[in-house]
């Protein structure tokens, strides 16, 4: 019964993964119209419960009222530190109790100073930082 929000979804690989593992609902957000159309088409073909929305992430988060069990974000690696901070602040109010935020980022960025940080997991040049609030 997990509700997932996939931010900066791109072509939807993470969304498909969560949907294939039994997530009740996956919402994919990306600002690129072609990516959203691709996700919609693929989700329909694979009969997956994925809602794809074309939107800029930070404005979307600031207007969002739905709550989620898991939020995954794979933002551009050139984000400034304060944008990561703003993103975690906006997602904190959208997580259900015991909900988790996961941010994928470059290994040269240290997000451990951001409120809610719990751990890092390293995968080559990529790091997944976990947050709970």
Model-derived regions, located:
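Class I S-adenosyl-L-methionine-dependent methyltransferase catalytic core
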Residues: 1-133
């Amino acid at each position: 019964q997990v509700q997932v929000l996939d931010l900066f979804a791109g072509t939807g690989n993470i969304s498909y993964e969560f949907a294939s593992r039994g997530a009740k609902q996956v919402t994919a957000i990306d600002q690129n119209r072609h990516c959203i159309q691709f996700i919609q088409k693929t989700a329909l073909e694979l009969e997956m419960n994925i809602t794809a929305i074309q939107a800029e992430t930070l404005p979307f988060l600031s207007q969002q009222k739905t709550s989620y069990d898991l939020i995954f974000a794979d933002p551009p690696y050139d984000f400034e530190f304060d944008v990561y901070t703003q993103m975690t602040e906006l997602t904190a109010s959208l997580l259900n109790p015991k909900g988790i935020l996961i941010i994928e980022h470059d290994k040269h960025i240290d997000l451990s100073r951001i409120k809610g940080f719990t751990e890092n997991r390293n995968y080559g040049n990529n790091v997944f930082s976990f947050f709970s609030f």
